[in-house]
Design a protein with these regions (language model features):
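N-terminal secretory/targeting leader peptides
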Residues: 1-161
Length: 161
């Protein structure tokens, strides 16, 4: 497999292996140079981060495996939540959901604009079969960690769209 820069740490390294790569721990601050010199062949980062950090200057292609799912979490102390009246809780919940939806929409727009920029710059953008990646990687995860997962966890993971 390719030498794929993954963050240091057991779980990140295992993720790289599960994707069929040779994971190479490289500090984020050293990634540009690692790509430039061939220490690594590729990287594992959102495309927007790749543009902001100018990794596209030393990268010719982007493969959108979408193997990490980002999500928003809105949290509030239970003491504060419990002190609210039901109508206040409902308003807070609605505002939180609206904020998360707007954040997701902005992220998706920024990602689409970044991918369009990469294509205009002559970069190749590939979108492989997500199910093939999931099946390949999931087998390794189930073998290594499956016995430690709560009952039904895999089904809930696979239900995410």
């Amino acid at each position: 497999g390719i030498k794929l820069r993954m963050p240091p740490g057991e779980f990140w390294q295992f993720l790289g292996e599960s994707l069929g790569a040779n994971p190479t721990p490289v500090a984020y601050a050293e990634l540009y140079t690692a790509l430039q010199t061939g220490t690594v062949d590729g990287q594992d980062n959102p495309v927007v981060a790749s543009k902001l950090m100018k990794f596209d200057e030393v990268t010719t292609q982007f493969i959108l495996t979408r193997h990490v799912i980002a999500y928003d979490v809105m949290a509030i102390r239970s003491k504060i939540w419990d002190a609210m009246k039901p109508e206040q809780q409902a308003k807070f919940q609605a505002a939180a959901e609206k904020a998360m939806d707007e954040n997701t929409a902005r992220f998706e727009k920024q990602e689409a604009e970044t991918l369009e920029y990469f294509k205009k710059e002559g970069k190749k953008v590939y979108e492989p079969d997500q199910n093939a990646f999931r099946t390949f990687a999931q087998k390794r995860y189930v073998e290594k960690y499956g016995n430690d997962w709560p009952k039904g966890a895999l089904e809930r993971i696979n239900a995410v769209k």
